[in-house]
Amino acid sequence: MKWVPLSNLHVDVPKDVTRPTITTSDEPDTLYKRLSILVKAHDRAVLDSYEYFAVLAAKELGISIKVHEPPRKIERFTLLKSVHIFKKHRVQYEMRTLYRCLELKHLTGSTASVYLEYIQRNLPEGVAMEVTKTQIQQLPEHIKEPMWETVPEEKKESKS
């Protein structure tokens, strides 16, 4: 890289421009009917920020996305202040877990993998993610033809 001064601005001019190689394959890409991403956190501000980031990334890739907020889960622990005595003196702790569910519909496998890798690499601290993929598959050959066409003629005559 070479720095070129241009009216007190530095412009990055690349010397050797090499194009990235694009690989193609003959295998058909997997199709997903739905991609469900459940994001969990304890801090609402972090969760709101991450939801905004994930929705913005999906819109940039042209993916349709829906977001809904399941009810939060609150776990409470009641402990004695003292280990051995004073049963009346207790302390309560609680953990509030907030959830966001991101629903992506009708994706190709390559788009889904690129999107998931991007949002997983930018996952903030204290945030957990669960991904559920619903794949579209072709119907097997033994199920395609109706059952009554595979029954032999002898069984049909004996029932009549």
UniProtKB/Swiss-Prot annotation:
GO biological-process terms attached to the record:
mitochondrial translation
Q: Which UniProt keywords are listed?
A: Mitochondrion, Ribonucleoprotein, Ribosomal protein
List, alphabetically, the InterPro entries matched.
Answer: Ribosomal_uS10 (IPR001848), Ribosomal_uS10_dom (IPR027486), Ribosomal_uS10_dom_sf (IPR036838), Ribosomal_uS10m (IPR040055)
Mind telling me which GO cellular component terms the entry cites?
Answer: mitochondrial inner membrane; mitochondrial small ribosomal subunit; mitochondrion
Top-level taxon in the UniProt lineage: Eukaryota
Q: Does the keyword Mitochondrion apply?
A: yes
What compartments host this protein? Mitochondrion
Q: Which Pfam families match?
A: Ribosomal_S10
One GO MF annotation is: structural constituent of ribosome
Segments crossing the lipid bilayer: none
The annotated subunit structure for this chain is:
Component of the mitochondrial ribosome small subunit (28S) which comprises a 12S rRNA and about 30 distinct proteins.
Q: Which family does it belong to?
A: Belongs to the universal ribosomal protein uS10 family.
**Identification of the protein by name:** Small ribosomal subunit protein uS10m
Please name the source species. Answer: Mus musculus
